[in-house]
């Protein structure tokens, strides 16, 4: 059997710790997350959690970052513009139907961030980046002549983030109430008609 490198062992440990954190968040919210419980859940000591992340805040920030990485596959290979925007809208909701504990934890934490001094700044920054990415796609689409000149990218971006996150939360709360794939297709068709030049 081939020995794993230090880096591979570290990545395996971090993945296990993030998964344990996500599971706790999904089950009971942020209040249930302690470094000791994360370590126990992952099969490690509290000390290893502290060693890897330093604090609960850093652990939660790492969870938020990891949960968003690659959530909507294939977008990085696309050029900015209307096509990328429409793919995001459809694929984001399509991905919701198959999300794992990391992404579920992201949505739970996003909802909790409204009343949390710990989470508020993290999610304000994340949402600002998400809106900026969407607005950049719309601006590129406008420059290419694919998006109407009177469209306000920042306003549309705020609406779209609310739609995507709101529909995802609805699915998380009541999975039988919404078909995420169908919702994604409907939202794509709506925005294609609303934005088209």
Protein language model annotation of sequence segments:
Residues 62, 73-104, 153-160, 184:
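Hydrophobic alpha-helical connector segments
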Residues 1-12, 173:
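N-terminal intrinsically disordered/low-complexity leader segments
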């Amino acid at each position: 059997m081939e020995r794993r490198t230090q880096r591979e062992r570290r990545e395996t440990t971090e993945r296990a710790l993030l998964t344990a954190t996500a599971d706790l968040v999904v089950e009971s919210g942020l209040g249930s997350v302690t470094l000791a419980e994360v370590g126990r859940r992952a099969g490690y000591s509290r000390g290893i959690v502290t060693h890897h992340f330093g604090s609960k805040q850093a652990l939660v920030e790492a969870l938020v970052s990891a949960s968003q990485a690659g959530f909507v596959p294939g977008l990085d290979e696309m050029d900015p513009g209307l096509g990328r925007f429409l793919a995001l809208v459809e694929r984001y909701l399509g991905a919701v139907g198959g999300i794992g504990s990391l992404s579920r934890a992201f949505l739970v934490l996003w909802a909790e961030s409204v009343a949390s001094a710990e989470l508020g700044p993290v999610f304000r920054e994340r949402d600002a980046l998400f809106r900026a990415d969407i607005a950049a796609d719309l601006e590129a689409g406008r420059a290419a002549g694919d998006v109407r000149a009177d469209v306000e990218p920042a306003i549309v971006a705020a609406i779209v983030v609310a739609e995507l996150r709101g529909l995802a939360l609805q699915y998380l709360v009541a999975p039988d109430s919404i078909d995420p794939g169908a919702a994604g297709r409907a939202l794509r068709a709506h925005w294609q008609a609303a934005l088209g030049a």
